[in-house]
Amino acid sequence: MAEDSEWVPESIAGFLGSPDWLIPLAEFMESRCSVFDDEDENKLTYTEIHQQYKQLVERLLENYMQDVGISEQQFLEACSSFSSSASLQTVFQPVLATDDFQMFRSLMVQKNMELQLQALHVIKQRNGGLPECLTDGVDVMSELEQQEMKILQEVLRRSKEEYDLQMGQCGLGSEDLASTSSSVSETPQNPEQRLSNGVSDPLTLTQPDSEMEESSTATQRKMEESEPTATTACKSKALPAVRAPLRGSVVAKQSSAERERELERARDTHTDCRTLTDEVALQQRSEYLKQQRDKLQALKRQTGKGLTDTAAAAAPEPKPATQEISVEEKKKLQKRKHVAEKLKEEVIKK
């Protein structure tokens, strides 16, 4: 029995090196290896192609075992003997790839690289060298990437400069506001100081001189009577200064409202005047047009009369339609008729 089973590994090794096995596998790999690459990602198409490869190998092995008469048990024992020898592992590798996906993937990637190298060799033989797209492709891409990086850096630099300018302008604006607010806060609020500087409150301008004198004397008496309560006096002095701008603002608002009313009235009057002038102009224009129309009609009438007169003068006198026939002509006509009748009679007799 042992001698009978010794020929099985040799026959299997011979089949795996025969064209019946190598040609179908080579055609399958060459037609489907272009999808496989060196990336670590396992795509769905890889598994589908692996299933198709497994079905092909099983069909070829089944046909071989049926032709030779080998059982599956004998085939598995021969496969275990192949694993011990390193030289036969490369021959038996396509069979093991049916159960090992990574081995199948490595075989397909290797086949794809071999086909690419063969294609480059053929192109080099035909053209005498490789084209620039195949030799300088990496360098061109790197140059494009460098240009893009330079453009991005320039854009970032300009955007940063614009941002700094905007922030600087905002800082200057805030400093100007702070300076204006500080200058406003430093201005004196005391009415006596404002009067000494030549600036007067709107209330003080509206008050008469007698009231001003009375208010000044009253304040002096109060100051003399209540010297210890200086703080209250200061507060009472500060009150008019606070109220004055409010009243002034009210007066300003009233004056602005009055100005607006006056402007509206002026506009209304202007529009009324414009409408009146437009109506007058329309009336004058219509009258002028009527006058011109009357003149044209009169001229047409005069020219029509002149034409009729000239036509009547130039026309010849009509000749009488029927002139009276003289006696001599009547006699001649009768003679002609008589001659014509005689001629007719002679012709008829003949």
From Swiss-Prot:
It holds the Pfam family ARL2_Bind_BART. Residues 177-220 have a biased composition (Polar residues). Residues 142-167, 280-350 form a coiled coil. One of its GO terms (cellular component) is nucleus. Residues 171-233, 301-337 are annotated as: Disordered. Keywords: Cell projection, Cilium, Coiled coil, Cytoplasm, Flagellum, Nucleus. InterPro entries: BART_dom (IPR023379), BART_sf (IPR042541), CFAP36 (IPR038888). Its main location: nucleus. Gene3D superfamilies: ADP-ribosylation factor-like 2-binding protein, domain. Belongs to the CFAP36 family. PANTHER family: CILIA- AND FLAGELLA-ASSOCIATED PROTEIN 36 (PTHR21532:SF0), PHOSPHODIESTERASE HL (PTHR21532). This is Cilia- and flagella-associated protein 36. The lineage of its organism: Eukaryota, Metazoa, Chordata, Craniata, Vertebrata.
